[in-house]
Amino acid sequence: MRTLVMVACAVSLAACSSPPKPPTVSGRHRIPINSPAAQEELRLQVFPQEPTAQATMWPARPPKQTVNVYFPQDVTVFRPTSAQINQLHTLLWPVPKHINVRGLTDNNCPPPGDTQVARVRALAIYNWLINQGVPASRITISYAPVKDYASNAPLSPGRVLNRRVDIEILRK
């Protein structure tokens, strides 16, 4: 019995110690290294291209755009129309580098009242922009009762152009 175990161990050790057969090489997976396709693949590995899908997704835009939002007299609540929402959404995406919000009035009230109206209008636009997903760190607010008149006309149609909030969108 002992000899049978010894012989079985010797046979199994001899079988394990033989080297494996070398693989056969057929050559069917060979790729010529100097072919134009191989050179192009190597060039793309070394210098990958930027994805072009985003370039076609968002058309080129000017570095600075301004949108004017007009308000009725002494109204500070921002209730955008669907046209205003569409225009602003088009300009806000992708999120611009910075947005300046300037509240302005028509100088109809004494300066302290006009300053408050301009400030609250600018804050209304600021809050709307934040609710639309624009980071607060990218928005600057300013307001002034007497500044940057669009119209110096003393009559109501000219004054309407002065009751506004300018939204200046900076891309660069």
Curated annotation (Swiss-Prot):
Keywords assigned: Cell outer membrane, Lipoprotein, Membrane, Palmitate, Signal, Virulence
GO cellular component, one term: cell outer membrane
Upper lineage: Bacteria, Pseudomonadati, Pseudomonadota, Alphaproteobacteria, Hyphomicrobiales
Subcellular location: Cell outer membrane
Annotated signal sequence range: 1-15
Residues carrying lipid (S-diacylglycerol cysteine): C16
Keyword Signal: yes
InterPro entries: OmpA-like (IPR006665), OmpA-like_sf (IPR036737)
Record-linked Pfam families: OmpA
Organism, as annotated: Brucella abortus (strain 2308)
Superkingdom as given in the UniProt entry: Bacteria
Protein's recorded name: Type IV secretion system putative outer membrane lipoprotein BAB2_0057
PROSITE patterns from the UniProt entry: OMPA_2 (PS51123), PROKAR_LIPOPROTEIN (PS51257)
